[in-house]
From Swiss-Prot:
Gene name in the database record: rpsF
Listed GO MF terms: small ribosomal subunit rRNA binding; structural constituent of ribosome
Family: Belongs to the bacterial ribosomal protein bS6 family.
NCBIfam families associated with the record: S6 (TIGR00166)
Entry keywords, A to Z: Ribonucleoprotein, Ribosomal protein, RNA-binding, rRNA-binding
Protein name: Small ribosomal subunit protein bS6
Length: 96
């Protein structure tokens, strides 16, 4: 049974518009191919990190994904997020 999820990605701040759009399109395709529905993508903008660095960056671009999917779909997508060098961090929450 599909559940509602929210995933926040922190993306490298040095990506220009075209590579960023390509990254988001790839991620959207991966989710849809694995059965995710109701996908909404929101760009939350660039923010400085609070006194620390992630992979030598002091800021990151926050992108929020809201969707409904099976748990196995989320696990498959997170495997892809782990190996993508443009993504500094991510966190997925199940929404009630």
């Amino acid at each position: 049974m599909p559940r509602a999820y929210e995933t926040m990605l922190i993306v490298r701040p040095d990506l220009s518009d075209e590579p960023l759009q390509q990254l988001l399109t790839e991620q959207e395709s991966l989710l849809r191919e694995n059965g995710a529905t109701g996908l909404e993508i929101t760009n939350r903008g660039k923010r400085r990190f609070a006194g620390f660095e992630m992979k030598k960056f002091k800021e990151g671009l926050y992108i929020q994904f809201n969707y409904e999917a099976e748990p196995r779909t989320v696990a498959t997508w997170e495997k892809n997020l782990r190996i993508n060098e443009s993504i500094l961090r991510y966190m997925t929450l199940r929404v009630n």
